[in-house]
Amino acid sequence: MAPFAPLASCILLLLWVTAPSRACTCAPPHPQTALCNSQIVIRAKFVGTAEVNQTDLNRRYEIKMTKMFKGFSALGNASDIRFVDTPALESVCGYLHRSQNRSEEFLVAGNLRDGHLQINTCSFVAPWSSLSTAQRRGFTKTYAAGCEGCTVFTCSSIPCKLQSDTHCLWTDHFLTGSDKGFQSRHLACLPREPGICTWQSLRPRMA
């Protein structure tokens, strides 16, 4: 059987090299979309990891919530969120928290499942300090005003065409190759008049 060992090794190597990539990929959402499409949006500190039943294939982070922006009704009688669950493997969209600073606050947007906050690679999770003043204002109050009747519509190729008067064309990805462009950091898609939504500045208006 020995002469066949090198051949078997070559076949296995070839299968490994040519196997399709299973990495999780997704485009980060506009922060307004993240708030509108999430059940829970909070500010929190990641303070540690907790033991989870390994058969669940989940990773659990212990957090300390410092502020809730959305989710009071979804939590029901619960007054706090202490844990965040995510798939254990990055290949299946598991979120890996890399910061070792336990005092650093993060904006975390996710959904509830079986009473636990769930996030993944595609979720909006960002250091609070990295958000612009306009984005902080948006999460605190303004983004919610556009959730019911307005939609941030991503432009992924030319020509970009709006499908509705309630859509705002988001071109940051296409023009800059980044989700952190001007529209993301400074604008919200809000009602201008009934049936019409436009990009509006999140800067405070002067009296």
UniProtKB/Swiss-Prot annotation:
Query: Where does the NTR domain start and stop, copy by copy?
Result: 24-147
Keyword Protein transport on this protein? Answer: no
User: In what tissue types does this protein appear?
Assistant: Ubiquitously expressed. Highest expression in kidney and ovary.
> Which residues does the annotation flag as glycosylated?
N53, N77, N101
Q: Which residues form the signal peptide?
A: 1-23
Q: Which InterPro entries match?
A: Netrin_domain, TIMP, TIMP-like_OB-fold, TIMP_C
The record's keywords, sorted A to Z, are: Disulfide bond, Glycoprotein, Growth factor, Metal-binding, Metalloenzyme inhibitor, Metalloprotease inhibitor, Phosphoprotein, Protease inhibitor, Secreted, Signal, Zinc
| One Pfam match | TIMP
**Post-translational modification, briefly?**
The activity of TIMP1 is dependent on the presence of disulfide bonds.
Query: Which GO-annotated molecular functions does the record name?
Result: cytokine activity; growth factor activity; metal ion binding; metalloendopeptidase inhibitor activity
* Localization, UniProt: Secreted
Q: Name the segments for region: Involved in metalloproteinase-binding.
A: 24-27, 90-91
Residues bound to Zn(2+) are C24
Tell me one GO biological process term.
cellular response to UV-A
Q: What subunit structure does UniProt give? A: Interacts with MMP1, MMP3, MMP10 and MMP13, but has only very low affinity for MMP14. Interacts with CD63; identified in a complex with CD63 and ITGB1.
Which family is it part of? Answer: Belongs to the protease inhibitor I35 (TIMP) family.
Per its record, how is this protein called by name? Answer: Metalloproteinase inhibitor 1
Species assigned in the record: Canis lupus familiaris
